[in-house]
Amino acid sequence: MKKHVVLCGITLALLSVGAPLPDRHADDPDLIPDQYIVMLKAGANARDVIVGHGLAPAHHYSHAVHGFASHVPPGQLKMLKNDWRVQSVEPDRVVRLVTHVSATGSAVTVSGEALPTGVDRVDADLHPRKDVSSVGIAIIDTGVDLEHADLNVAGNVTFARGTKSGNDDNGHGSHVAGIAAAKADGYGVRGVAPNAKLYAVKVLDRAGSGQLSWVIAGVDWVTKNAKAKGIKVANMSLGFQGDSPALYAAISASVNAGVTYVVAAGNSGINAALFSPANHPAVITVSAIADSDGKCGGLGSATAYGEDDSFASFSNWGPVVDLAAPGVNILSTYKAGTYATLSGTSMASPHVAGAAAHYLAAYPTTTPAEVLVMLRLNATPQTNACGFDGDPDTYKEPLLNVKTLP
């Protein structure tokens, strides 16, 4: 369980924040030259630092963390790092979707209301609570289709360069949103937490790519607006291999503010501990199973990523993973008012985000740590017959079960 890595994670983060990071652009092509995330010490005036160094920040952070993101000319970097008001200077980097295996999705025509196999498998449709509109879910992603008839979009914001709104120009974020919260209104598809309020927080562009500074800006916005807008859950189906002290600190502060973060484990088929934010000890990290019929028993047809009721061949794994959920051939909403099927831990994660919202609708004062405990207590233990044949590690995370939640 993740509790086994909390102390190591906190120690690493504190050490990293306390010392400037070396320049590693030559070693990591995803680091963006001359772009930095600057964290300031408590009480430092951001404007004074910015003006003093002649910077023009792209983003200001003031709720989850205290600092800014800016282009810093090479000749000024050393002076900035040595400024007594600066806690850390971290290179900005490229962040991508937790690559969904079926890159563009398969278009689907939906008649009436379809019950996706994932929602069926976690028994979300059998829970007596049918409306979760009191809870807000932030989709930190490529945006959400703001006009989709099957989604209750309550607000949007964008931090992706060159965009003017949180509208989805990729499709991934809309798909994630529908899994979590598509309306149960007799039309389209049904989500795990029907009609939950969705907040589109666009931090990735049309290609599903963005910058770490954009993601931190998204987390900062969620933290700022959580109380006023009722945002109790945030889904992040994105990440990168490595660690970021700034992102770690931002998520930690947002969780402390009461937001439950649910994160995809990743699709590299390796240990999820290598990836951020999946390795953050305070988030709920989700792996994926292959399920083709929405039922336990292994009697459905085989998929491209494993037999029915097996651990998805692409899914990351390891002790940082908290729960498993369906993530293969998942039907959900898509951009431009359409529907599509996608595969990936990106699709598994919003099942759990929806379940968290489901529980919080009835118990709104529950802390993120308590939400995880409740989801795990009500989850289905792993058996080879019911979704876990092929899990490569010795730690067997349980399968999400919504029906048994209070």
Tell where the protein language model's regions lie, with residue ranges.
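Active-site-proximal beta-strand/loop segments in catalytic clefts of secreted hydrolases
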Residues: M39-A42, V72-P73, E90-V94, I139-G143, ...
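Gly/Ser-rich catalytic serine loop of serine hydrolases
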Residues: T163-A177, I270, A340-V352
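Short glycine-/aliphatic-rich beta-strand segments at the starts of folded cytosolic domains
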Residues: I32-M39
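Gram-negative bacterial Sec-dependent N-terminal signal peptides
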Residues: K2-A19
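Protease zymogen maturation seam
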Residues: P22-A26, V51-V65, N82-G136, V144, ...
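C-terminal subdomain of the subtilisin-like protease fold in secreted/lumenal serine endopeptidases
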Residues: D28, P57-S62, R190-A196, A200, ...
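Extracellular S/T/G-rich loop segment that most often corresponds to the catalytic His/Ser-adjacent loop
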Residues: V135, D141-G143, V259, F275-A361, ...
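Subtilisin-like serine protease catalytic core
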Residues: D125-N156, S165-W214, K227-V233, D243, ...
